[in-house]
């Protein structure tokens, strides 16, 4: 297969003044000081219809509540949760339980079964434990059903099903009398010495706060609750019930980019409602070579993950193991070696801007070369910096807009006006649709308790929400002062990049080690010291403020908390050294063996 590449762009063809003015113009169109207030929560009040229930069997209401005493409770049975469980088993800990809201393993991949769903980083670095399971992904970018199959393969290999309680939705977790008590809405109660929240970053869907959203009479759902009863077909089969219908898709982020080609192949007509165009790079997906695993040496997956990390952050590498389109010259400048960077901050910022103008111009040139209609062509061009949005990669998305049955409805940055019983209104004009799909994403930077929809109460009756009122406070991005024996696998203040599986792999290894050592040594309580947590947060804030300065001219989106670049957002940023440095820091911490920064009580 011939590899696609982005068009070349000469630096001499770039007009920095024009681009600065254009970026600012597009940003100002989209500014909304309300931030999350412009979104509505799935399942709130009149939006109960958007709550996903069709993947839950009616067994939770009929079964008897369970009461369990155990050493460890893990909340969440997605990749993060089962990775934590595997680490416990590898450390000889077998007395644990997993508590999961859904009716199966999978987490994000259990709920997000929309057509076209795929991982958007390489399967070989996204799907964990490939060496341990001997599994080889069939494609460079695996599709949802295959990923779900792999998750269940892990659960089977480590015999996790007997230790997992499905359809058990946590309502509260309280620290009392040296134990955590976890209660569910089904009346269950789990008492444990240690608690791990592993609910992942894409758990709480959001809908646009559009007037009339509940008045629509046709089938409508959020992408994370795709209803195949309404559409027909499956994640891999044609959507037969859409064949005579006009389908509206609101949103043009990573989910819509994956979904549109599949829906366009099934529906009579598709209307795509766009606030901000996505930056769509080439993907070059294809089958895994037959001899892929033949020459791999032990430790290959971690090396490949680290190679991606370095490519993404622009660190020097000997060779690119990951043939990866995530490579960005802008990020190389931002994270490269000190000898490569101007020492003056103003000069560095200018260099970043010049470099990024060229990177994004290549994305826009791809639109020029792909889209036939001149108006649609201009509307699909992203006018912002690389750092502003999660990059998208697809080989068919842009081509869809050349199809006669696909029409872009650009809102010029304003979003839709309102929704009626059979239409979406943009700039006063009604656009009739038979079904409406919201690809409007998730709350990404909210806290663990809000993500999960349950309260976490630590010592002295203080909730995590109260403790994190100024923003997250952690040590290593994993533990919280005042919350003994509590661990959270999350993105805030941890080593994170677009491959969340690296964060989950690294964090679960650390959590498994700490719990195992504490159980072995008879530790009653373990938590970070206030000083260790304060020092970690100070470091995060310093890096976070720098990142927010670079994002100040971005259009609103989840990467910049919808334009709310305040101190609270800075505390939600990531370990500034990058994910590989975070892993090495934790490895050195374990090797040292003195539990630096953690206070252990016997």
Curated annotation (Swiss-Prot):
Which SUPFAM superfamilies does this chain map to? FAD/NAD(P)-binding domain (SSF51905)
A Gene Ontology molecular function term for this protein is:
monooxygenase activity
Q: Which cofactor does it need?
A: FAD
Q: Which residues bind FAD?
A: 108-111, 120-121, 126
What does the Swiss-Prot or TrEMBL cofactor note state?
Answer: Binds 1 FAD per subunit.
Q: In which pathway does it act?
A: Secondary metabolite biosynthesis
Please name the InterPro entries in this protein's record.
FAD-binding_Monooxygenases, FAD/NAD-bd_sf
Q: Write the signal peptide boundaries.
A: none
Q: Which Pfam families match?
A: Pyr_redox_3
> Which residues make up the annotated site Transition state stabilizer?
390
Q: How is it used?
A: Hypothemycin is an antifungal agent that exhibits excellent activity against Peronophythora litchii, which could be helpful for the storage of harvest litchi fruit. Hypothemycin is a strong inhibitor of a subset of MAP kinases such as human ERK2. It can therefore be used as an anti-cancer drug thanks to its inhibitory activity of Ras-mediated cellular signals. It can also inhibit Trypanosoma brucei kinase TbCLK1 which is a good candidate as a therapeutic target for African trypanosomiasis. Finally, hypothemycin also has inhibitor activity of T cell activation.
What enzyme category does the UniProt record give?
Answer: oxidoreductase
Query: Per the record's keyword annotation, is Flavoprotein included, yes or no?
Result: yes
Name the Enzyme Commission number(s) assigned to this protein.
1.14.13.-
Keywords per UniProt: FAD, Flavoprotein, Monooxygenase, NADP, Oxidoreductase
Sites binding NADP(+) sit at 118-120, 252-258, 275-276
Role summary: FAD-binding monooxygenase; part of the gene cluster that mediates the biosynthesis of hypothemycin, a resorcylic acid lactone (RAL) that irreversibly inhibits a subset of protein kinases with a conserved cysteine in the ATP binding site such as human ERK2. The first step is performed by both PKSs hmp3 and hmp8 and leads to the production of 7',8'-dehydrozearalenol (DHZ). The highly reducing PKS hpm8 synthesizes the reduced hexaketide (7S,11S,2E,8E)-7,11-dihydroxy-dodeca-2,8-dienoate, which is transferred downstream to the non-reducing PKS hpm3.
Q: What does the similarity note say?
A: Belongs to the FAD-binding monooxygenase family.
Q: What is this protein called?
A: FAD-binding monooxygenase hmp7
Chain's gene name: hpm7
């Amino acid at each position: 297969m011939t590899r696609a590449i982005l068009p070349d762009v000469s630096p001499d063809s770039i007009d920095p003044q024009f681009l600065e003015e254009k970026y600012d113009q597009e940003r100002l169109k989209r500014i909304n000081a309300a931030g999350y207030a412009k979104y509505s929560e799935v399942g709130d009040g009149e939006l109960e219809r958007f709550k996903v229930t069709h993947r839950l069997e009616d067994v939770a209401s009929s079964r008897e509540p369970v009461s369990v005493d155990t050493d460890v409770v893990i909340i969440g049975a997605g990749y993060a949760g089962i990775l934590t469980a595997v680490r416990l088993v590898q450390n000889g800990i077998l007395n644990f339980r997993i508590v999961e809201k859904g009716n199966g393993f999978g987490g994000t991949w259990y709920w997000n079964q929309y057509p076209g769903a795929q991982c958007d980083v390489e399967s070989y670095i996204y799907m964990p434990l490939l060496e341990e399971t001997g599994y080889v992904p069939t494609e460079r970018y695996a599709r949802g059903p295959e990923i779900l199959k792999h998750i269940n393969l892990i659960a089977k290999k480590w015999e996790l099903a007997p230790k997992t309680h499905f359809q058990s939705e946590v309502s509260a977790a309280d620290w009392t009398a040296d134990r955590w008590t976890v209660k569910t809405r089904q009346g269950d109660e789990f008492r444990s010495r240690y608690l791990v929240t592993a609910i992942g970053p894409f758990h709480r869907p959001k809908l646009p706060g559009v007037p009339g959203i509940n008045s629509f009479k046709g089938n409508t759902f959020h992408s994370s609750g795709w209803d195949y009863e309404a559409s027909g077909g499956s994640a891999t089969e044609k959507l037969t019930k859409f064949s005579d219908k006009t389908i509206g898709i609101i949103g043009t982020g990573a989910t819509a980019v994956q979904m549109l080609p599949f829906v366009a192949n099934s529906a009579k007509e598709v209307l795509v409602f766009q606030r901000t165009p996505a930056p769509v790079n080439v993907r070059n997906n294809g089958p895994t070579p037959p001899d892929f695993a033949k020459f791999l040496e032990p430790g290959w997956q971690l090396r490949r993950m680290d190679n991606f990390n370095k490519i993404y952050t622009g660190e020097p590498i000997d060779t690119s193991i990951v043939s990866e389109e995530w490579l960005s010259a802008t990020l190389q400048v931002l994270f490269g070696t000190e000898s490569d960077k101007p020492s003056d901050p103003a000069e560095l910022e200018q260099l970043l801007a010049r470099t990024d103008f060229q990177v994004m111009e290549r994305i826009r040139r791809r639109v020029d070369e792909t889209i036939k209609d001149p108006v649609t062509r201009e509307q699909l061009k992203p006018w912002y910096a690389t750092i502003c949005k999660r990059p998208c990669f697809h080989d068919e998305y842009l081509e869809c807009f050349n199809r006669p049955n696909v029409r872009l409805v650009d809102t010029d940055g304003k979003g839709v006006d309102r929704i009626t019983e059979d239409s979406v209104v943009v700039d006063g004009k009604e656009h009739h649709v038979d079904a409406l799909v919201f690809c409007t994403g998730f709350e990404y930077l909210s806290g663990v308790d809000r993500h999960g929809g349950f309260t976490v109460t630590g010592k002295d009756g203080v909730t995590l929400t109260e403790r994190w009122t100024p923003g997250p406070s952690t040590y290593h991005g994993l533990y919280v002062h005042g919350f003994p024996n509590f661990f959270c696998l999350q993105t805030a203040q941890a080593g994170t990049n677009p491959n969340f599986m690296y964060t989950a792999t690294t964090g679960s290894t650390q959590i498994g080690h700490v719990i195992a050592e504490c159980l072995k040594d008879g530790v009653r309580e373990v938590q970070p010291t206030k000083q260790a947590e304060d020092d970690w947060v100070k470091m995060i804030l310093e890096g976070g403020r720098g990142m927010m300065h670079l994002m100040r001219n971005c259009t609103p989106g989840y990467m910049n908390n919808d334009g709310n670049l305040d101190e609270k957002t800075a505390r939600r940023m990531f370990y500034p050294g990058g994910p590989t440095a975070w892993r090495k820091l934790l490895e050195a911490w374990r090797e040292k063996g003195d539990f630096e920064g953690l206070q252990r009580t016997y």
